């Protein structure tokens, strides 16, 4: 079943794949990494003015990495805002996705966390560096193929 946003994107010739609806009835779409930035700008202009959350996950060991965006269309006088979930999948070997920091500023720390935990590089992000792990940390802790080190060096905070 095609949702309202998917139908609008098809009408305007924008490439995507409908993934159906989640348990709350929120439409979920898949966008290719190379199309994501332009579609993000279009969605912002269309009215999706709030990035509620961005997260990422490892689909399967040795498989793709996914960056997930929950967007909300907030309008004055509308009691029930319209929501959509966008999934952008990236190759594990070279996980690169365009940053949407310049569209939704709230993507700043969220994209940095996804980079820090899974190694997804968000192109054109102004401060893409580790946010939770030390800069010297090797590897991406939330990847399913990550092997935890046997020894952690505790650094003196003083």
Curated annotation (Swiss-Prot):
Q: PROSITE patterns from the xrefs?
A: COMPLEX1_30K
Annotated GO biological process: photosynthesis, light reaction
Catalytic reaction annotation: a plastoquinone + NADH + (n+1) H(+)(in) = a plastoquinol + NAD(+) + n H(+)(out); a plastoquinone + NADPH + (n+1) H(+)(in) = a plastoquinol + NADP(+) + n H(+)(out)
A Pfam family for this UniProt protein? Complex1_30kDa
UniProt keyword DNA-binding, yes or no = no
What does the UniProt entry say about where the protein is found? Plastid, Chloroplast thylakoid membrane
- SUPFAM superfamilies attached here? Nqo5-like (SSF143243)
Establish whether keyword Plastid is in the entry: yes
What GO molecular-function term can you cite, just one?
NADH dehydrogenase (ubiquinone) activity
Which Gene Ontology terms of cellular component type are present? chloroplast thylakoid membrane
Record text on subunit structure and interactions: NDH is composed of at least 16 different subunits, 5 of which are encoded in the nucleus.
Function per UniProt? NDH shuttles electrons from NAD(P)H:plastoquinone, via FMN and iron-sulfur (Fe-S) centers, to quinones in the photosynthetic chain and possibly in a chloroplast respiratory chain. The immediate electron acceptor for the enzyme in this species is believed to be plastoquinone. Couples the redox reaction to proton translocation, and thus conserves the redox energy in a proton gradient.
Identify this protein by name: NAD(P)H-quinone oxidoreductase subunit J, chloroplastic
Name the species this protein comes from.
Answer: Vitis vinifera (Grape)
What are the top taxonomic ranks of the organism?
A: Eukaryota, Viridiplantae, Streptophyta, Embryophyta, Tracheophyta
